[in-house]
Amino acid sequence: MTTTEGLLMIPRLLLGGMLSLSLFVTGCSALRVSTSEQNSKPVEVGLRDSAQATPEPTEKAIPDGMEEVAVTLGEECPISVEFAIDRRWGDGVGYSGYWLYSNGDARLISVNCYAWGGTQPQDVTDEAMDVTFSESGSRVVSEKVGETPGGVFWTVQGVLGPSEVRSIASTESVLYGAVAGIRDDGRLYKVSVEMVAKSDDAEAAAVYAQMLPTVRFAGNALTPPPGLN
């Protein structure tokens, strides 16, 4: 297991305990096709917008019934993270570099940030694109790749197969996410927001579709995937 994989598994291992704490306190355009170089990966077909000239993203208004949160990630991460959140997801729990919001045990929003060992911001998003939807039954529905001050971002809407590490209770799940590689004071960081729910939870998916376009990293808005406003 690589260092990066180990870091990514830490939140998963602590998830059960953190959910219990949260419940106690509160009462959490081109086709992209991946083929046969890695036989274990499924064929993925989705709408992708990766034009060279990225229009300046515009900040989205906070949807009705939501409020903007500024996630404090401690010493692990100097990159600010803000987005609108439905109040039903509570105040969240976490530790330096990681924060988790939940609405029950099957509607999760995780925020991650840590120093990245590579050298190029694009390496961060390239790896995320390779591994996030890598198991059978997973697919990208819509995605956007672009530049942000100090780095590169990837926003995505997709479906996670039951065997994906991010899936809910080993069932097919939806994911709405934003990942970026951003330099700060000469150091490269990976920062992400991932919103996950079971694929039959249409209500949560509709909420996530409103939240994702409001995500900002380091104070900068990100362009959402095609189809999300």
Task: Give the label of every model feature segment.
Residues 186-197:
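Short, well-ordered beta-strand elements
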Residues 2-100, 196-229:
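N-terminal targeting sequences that direct proteins away from the cytosol to non-cytosolic compartments
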Residues 115-119, 195-200:
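A generic structural motif
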Residues 98-104, 154-156:
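Generic recognition of long tandem-repeat/solenoid scaffolds
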Residues 133-184, 226-227:
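Signature of long, low-cysteine stretches enriched in small and polar/charged residues
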